[in-house]
Amino acid sequence: MSRIQSVGARLRANWKNPEIRRHVGLLFLGKAIGLSIVLTLITRWFLPAMLGAQSATPTPALDPMAAVNAINTAWTLVAAFLVFGMQVGFVLLEAGFARSRESVNILVEGIADTCICGVTFWLWGFAFMFEPGNGFIGLHGFALQGLPATYGTTGVALLAFWVFQFAFADTCSTITSGAMIGRCGFVGDLLYSVGVTGFIYPIIGHWAWGPDGWLATMGPIAFHDFAGSTVVHTIGGVISLAGAIALGPRLGRVFKRDGGGPMPAHDLIIGAAGGLILWFGWYGFNPGSTLSALDTGGIGRVSFNTTLAACSAGLTALIYSYIRTKKWDLALTTNGFLAGLVAITCPCYWVDPVGAFFIGIGGGLVVVWGIDALEYLRIDDPIGAVPVHMIGGIWGTLSLGLFAAGKYGAPTPTGADVSTVVTGLFYGGGLGTLKAQFIGSAVVTVATFAAAMALMYGVKATGTLRVTAEGELEGLDLHEHGSSAYPEYMISGSESVILTIPVKDDAAA
């Protein structure tokens, strides 16, 4: 209390000083003048201008559908970016499971195929696949000319939908190279890539996904493929099989029935990491195919089913590998969960968790059986592209006719494919859906194989499909590209010699 009294006494004493009173007065006067100027500006200029602008420009009414379309477009683009990111997974998977002397070749082919896909899918591929024409091919919208701002009834911006579907086409193109690693010429790869992304994929894909595709509109029970077990993976896997047949096996590849076995992968860590990146990208592949961020129930169900099928497939392949060899096989487990992802891609919207679990188990089994079948038939598939994508895709397509739960449908602007409830055999739906799925899968498989064999042997006739024996023994990295992914090694034939730099021994000197 005494301290407060002393401070008050000092203030009273200072206030008696006329110089201090003058300074305080000037300070308050300046503050008052500044405040009056600000108030004048606000009341005489800023406020009337703002009120006048508001009265002259009425607030536009919010269009609810415009907001919905914007949200759905953003969701589709996010999914597209995830799917495109799968290219990283593909090149790592292929490079890791192949030999080291082919790693640069795999990456260059992956980049070149992506660029070819982008150009061809813009010029005519998208028109062939997604625009109206007839039941077999689209005939409008070449180079995206004359098309509306949004695609169909989805409300998604057309260019965003194109980016999403370009990523799908690029996935199919990348799958095709998997069984051809190690002996396919680079020029031959470029030639058949044009045929795949420019013709085979979009034309046959139109049958299932085009607005008037004959598979999508056949009979009272149509063929269904939600995110591409058939359209993307079966087509890609079948083309890969045709390429492996046309090329023949790699030099030095001896099959089990002849006393040999698969050539070892050069880096299983890279390969398995690539597989996990692919799994991550699948969360754009399947959930993004709803094309609707507001279909929250569908997105959640698709994401869950995708996860569960991959897990059950991976466990199945892992356990099966141990039963057969008493070893826990990393490569087989990786291909196992990938086959589960491929299989669930078609039915993921229409099945419940129980169905997804068993579809994944089926995927884990068929991929092992498929690898054994190729080995017996002496077909060289270095990474298992055919069992994972072709056989896994066929199984997933048929599984819809067995496990569709009969209670999921989305009467929203997400396309006719998910607007109808689908019921499988095991849920009381009879054989109708299974028949439709069998017809669609069989037709696509046979048509793709015929077209792919014609394409591969056509490219082979040019002399560019397979490299020379000398080039294959040298390694595609050096032979085709003049570089190596591992510059500290000299790759020559089947041997690798590490290069060392001599270092002066100070102690010996």
Indicate where each model-derived feature is located.
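Short, charged cytosolic
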Residues: 1-8
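Cytosolic juxtamembrane amphipathic/interface segments immediately preceding
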Residues: 9-24, 253-266
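Short, composition-biased linear "edge" segments at structural boundaries
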Residues: 45-49
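Glycine- and aromatic-enriched membrane alpha-helices
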Residues: 54-509
